[in-house]
């Protein structure tokens, strides 16, 4: 429960203590002239107060995004195909990182992998009424204080900010795909098999 709801809270959460082995600060050595190890007891902080999506995109490298992906999905073996960093403060507030995963055969298990936060407080992993249907296979995090905490379908569909955020996410994904195509068409074509799969109607259970 703590990991799900408090993983990225902006204040540190201490849960007991942890013990690490460190070199003796006084430089004491053993019989083999090696610096001895001593125990260092410190607070066990269980949350990440500064997750990648709260940082400026210019301060992050590709390996940082991949590392955060592994932090979100430690059981995911494959690296994502690409990522999109959301960072908007007008006319609505929206931050986050969305990843396009390497799709598995069973597309259904890939859903509900986008977590919604409000100021780093977890709200829900059901974003079907916030993120367009054809993008719900994306993974990642979106954080916005402008999305109402009442996440009922009818309430979200009527909210103006939600509509703007949904449209913005769609444009960002389209822009990313366009840039990928223009920048490195060969690489884009290699990833296209995974990308186009998410647009098949059967992915959403519709016939």
How does the language model describe each region?
Residues 1-207:
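Conserved GHKL (Bergerat-fold) ATPase module
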């Amino acid at each position: 429960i703590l990991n799900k709801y408090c993983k990225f809270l902006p204040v540190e959460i201490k849960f007991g203590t942890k013990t690490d082995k460190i070199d003796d600060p006084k430089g004491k050595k053993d019989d083999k002239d090696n610096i001895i190890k001593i125990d260092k007891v410190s607070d066990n902080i269980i949350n990440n107060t500064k997750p990648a999506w709260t940082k400026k995109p210019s301060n992050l490298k590709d390996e940082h995004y991949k590392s955060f992906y592994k932090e979100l999905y430690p059981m995911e073996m494959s690296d994502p195909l690409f990522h999109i960093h959301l960072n908007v403060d007008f006319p609505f507030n929206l931050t986050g990182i969305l990843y396009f995963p390497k799709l598995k055969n069973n597309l259904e298990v890939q859903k509900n992998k986008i977590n919604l936060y409000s100021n780093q407080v977890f709200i829900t992993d059901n974003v079907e009424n916030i993120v367009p249907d054809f993008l719900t296979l994306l993974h990642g995090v979106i954080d916005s204080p402008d999305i109402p905490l009442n996440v009922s379908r009818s309430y979200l569909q009527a909210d103006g900010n939600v509509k703007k955020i949904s449209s913005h996410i769609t444009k960002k994904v389209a822009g990313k795909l366009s840039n990928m195509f223009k920048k490195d068409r060969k690489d884009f074509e290699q990833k296209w098999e995974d990308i186009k799969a998410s647009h098949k109607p059967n992915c959403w259970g519709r016939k």
